[in-house]
Amino acid sequence: MEGGGERDHEAEPEYHCHDFEWEDLRADVEANPSFSHHLSPFPTTAASPSPSSEAWRSFHRRHASGRFFKERRYLLKEFPDLLNNNDVAKMLEVGCGNGSTVVPILRCSRNNIVYACDCSKDTLEKANEIVNNTEGLDGKDRFHPFLLDVSKETFPDWLFCKSCQMSNAKAVDLLLDSSEHNTRKEHPVLLKENQCCVGGIDAVTMRCVSVLKPGGLVLFRDYGLYDMTMLRFSPSQRVGFREYMRADGTFSYFFTLDTMRELFHAAGLLELELEYCCVRSINRKNGKSMQRVWVHGKFQKPTR
């Protein structure tokens, strides 16, 4: 595996996931009166702003001049499946940003091919620039970015493999149009209080599953309940149950294991791994300890 430039001298990335117990953090949060606004049900009659893709486009335009996000090289240790050295592996990243995930995936194996979508044209151009200009990467013909807002649009036909092009596409259309889906959207089991993220995340999940070949994997990592960033939000920033709006208009949702289990099981996937990743890090400027929480999940599409 070829490197380039200063990368030969970079420290080996570390991966931590059990620095503390999530249940201990939960007990501390729920016993702290200052966090009570995070725990109370969100009133269903409250008028909340609707999430806008334009907020993310503006975010990426503001950070287009530099590498706002560092390479997420730790993902190769969190998900060893990405370390593919034998067969050609085609991957899809939904919401690729500026390529901070794509670069280490392409670098770790010349057999990896990555398709990546985002709702921002500016950030796709930046990601393509970074991939093409990263020394020793040779990812020009292995990186295929395309513009798509997955919260509103279905994937293009050319992305579907032969084994799933007909059956999965039809299955998703039937699900999205069915009375069962309409009932779920109105009365979801675990998402009843929040409508999760931008609302309709169950439809987004099904769209992702629709382009996954039988036996393929969904690798998931996102904010987990009681992450440090969640606890910093004020009551006025709360726009839903476990959902908050930042000052720039972008939204953050904090997942639970039950939420993810329900979403992917409803989409027909098998649960292989699902846990909270609990990481304690130290702020080098002020020396304060930070407790970070992510949900780590790996799900597989059945072969039959």
Identify the role of each PLM range.
Residues 224-286:
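C-terminal alpha-helical "lid/dimerization" subdomain adjacent to the S-adenosyl-L-methionine
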Residues 280-304:
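Core SAM-dependent methyltransferase catalytic element
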Residues 188-190, 202-214:
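A short glycine-rich, Lys/Arg-flanked "PGG" loop and its adjoining helix->strand segment in the class I
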Residues 89-185:
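Class I SAM-dependent methyltransferase SAM/SAH-binding core
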Residues 66-90, 100, 104:
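Conserved alpha-helix/loop element of class I SAM-dependent methyltransferases that forms part
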Residues 49-62, 66-70:
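S-adenosyl-L-methionine
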Residues 215-222:
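Conserved beta-strand signature within the Rossmann-like core of class I S-adenosyl-L-methionine
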Residues 1-50:
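N-terminal auxiliary segments of SAM/dcSAM-dependent transferases
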